[in-house]
Amino acid sequence: MGDLWLFLLLPLSAFHGVKGCLECDPKFIEDVGSLLGNLIPSEVPGRTQLLERQIKEMIHLSFKVSHSDKRLRVLAVQQVVKLRTWLKNEFYKLGNETWKGVFIYQGKLLDVCQNLESKLKELLKNFSEIACSEDCIVVEGPILDCWTCLRMTNRCFKGEYCGDEDPRKAENREIALFLILLATAVILGSAVLLFHFCIFHRRKMKAIRRSLKEYVEKKLEELMGKIDEKEEKDFRLRK
């Protein structure tokens, strides 16, 4: 009953969740789950959890590869089918071997996953180099967008499918960068002007204080002179 619940849930999760090249066909995920289920005897403890974990790792591997680089997004449907067939054959080979325990099984399945990752990366990279080149070679059959699971009839690609940036996004980034530079220039200019204003104001205040001091000293000298003259006159009158 646990296996049945797991296999019924897989197509639903594949439909609603993120995609990779291999899981665009929900039937393929069911087949993988069924093949993996045949590899593990029913008496193995925690069999359902083990199956669920292995299937999730397999699905995540396909997603991880196709989303690791913007250029690893499109692939010929024919190549996807061949890759799925290869993976099923690997599972059939494991199924024909004698069961030697969970750890041996996980080790062999890890080898299959590593080979699958390597093959998928190589196929996506080679196809991208051809489909995104200026003199791209015509590819027969439909092309699969591994991110959306849409089939396309395009033979050559450019823009986001080849890792090139969206012109609008690039333009918006340039505008944002210009505004940032402009704001930085305004702030720096204002700081320089404020600095010069403070220096000029400080010098001006020093000059004013100096002039005021000289003026006060001069007036004091004049006042002291007048006082001395007055005292001298008073002294003479007393005589």
UniProtKB/Swiss-Prot annotation:
> Any idea which UniProt keywords this protein has?
Cell membrane, Cytoplasmic vesicle, Differentiation, Glycoprotein, Membrane, Signal, Spermatogenesis, Transmembrane, Transmembrane helix
Per the record, ranges on the Extracellular side are 21-174
Q: Which residues form the signal peptide?
A: 1-20
Q: Where are the transmembrane segments?
A: 175-195
| InterPro entries from the UniProt entry | IZUMO (IPR029389)
Positions annotated as glycosylated: 96, 126
Is Calcium among the key words of this record?
no
A Gene Ontology annotation in the biological process aspect, one of them, is: acrosome assembly
Q: What membrane topology is annotated for this entry?
A: Single-pass type I membrane protein
One cellular-component annotation, GO: plasma membrane
Primary location group: membrane
Care to name a GO molecular-function term for this sequence? protein homodimerization activity
Question: Which residues face the membrane's Cytoplasmic side?
Answer: 196-239
Q: Where in the cell is it found?
A: Cell membrane; Cytoplasmic vesicle, Secretory vesicle, Acrosome inner membrane
Q: Which domain of life is it from?
A: Eukaryota
The record's function comment reads:
Plays an important role in the biogenesis of the acrosome during sperm development.
**Entry's family note:** Belongs to the Izumo family.
Additional comment: Izumo is the name of a Japanese shrine to marriage.
Its quaternary structure? Monomer and homodimer.
Report what the protein is called.
Izumo sperm-egg fusion protein 3
Source organism per UniProt = Homo sapiens
